């Protein structure tokens, strides 16, 4: 549908955690059936062998470090990563490891600005930040957050900036739709199909 864009499929939880064989099959389906151009895998050193196997199978891989949502339970929730010197060093080392393993790009999520900046400046592959400050090579936000698909009562993460209030617009439209149906104001003749009057009369007589 969009031949000029690079489509990266985010591999779901457990699709690359069990063994290399399953990981290859699942990633291969994204490429062959889903028409993705690449896949994204969360994690650092523990994902090294999977990443290498995918790349050996000619499947481009994007890495993902920092706050990795699929590991949030082990992390104690959605918490910023790399806030101590030792943890920042570990992130830096894992970023280099992913680059050496063959990743063509990397997402850095939920890490201090200075950590993401240091990693970005020392890698030769591009970094994409989400909650990682402004010094990464690119930026991303979840589309639902960006356009405001959730109620204002929902507390967004600190790094989210709403560029719209789609929730309000959607709710307004749905309520108007409901009202029109209940009052028989929709559908009208404008939204309905007709047939020839002679056929219509014959149908009524039949």
Descriptions of predicted regions:
Residues 1-164, 168-206:
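Alpha/beta enzyme core
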């Amino acid at each position: 549908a969009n031949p000029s864009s690079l489509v990266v499929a985010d591999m779901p939880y457990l699709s690359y955690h069990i063994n290399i064989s399953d990981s290859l099959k699942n990633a291969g389906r994204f490429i062959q059936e889903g028409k993705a151009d690449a896949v994204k895998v969360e994690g650092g050193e523990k994902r090294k062998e999977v990443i290498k196997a995918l790349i050996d199978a000619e499947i481009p891989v994007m890495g993902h470090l920092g706050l990795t949502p699929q590991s949030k339970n082990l992390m104690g929730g959605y918490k910023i990563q790399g806030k101590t010197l030792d943890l920042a060093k570990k992130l830096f080392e894992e970023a280099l490891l992913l680059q050496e393993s063959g990743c063509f790009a990397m997402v850095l999520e939920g890490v201090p600005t200075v950590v993401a900046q240091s990693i970005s400046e020392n890698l030769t592959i591009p970094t994409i930040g989400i909650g990682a400050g402004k010094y990464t090579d690119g930026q991303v936000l979840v589309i639902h957050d960006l356009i405001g698909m959730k109620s204002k009562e929902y507390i967004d993460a600190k790094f989210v900036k709403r560029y719209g209030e789609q929730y309000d617009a959607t709710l307004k439209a749905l309520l108007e739709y409901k009202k029109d149906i209940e009052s028989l104001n929709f559908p009208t003749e404008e939204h309905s199909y007709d047939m020839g009057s002679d056929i219509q009369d014959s149908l009524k007589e039949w």
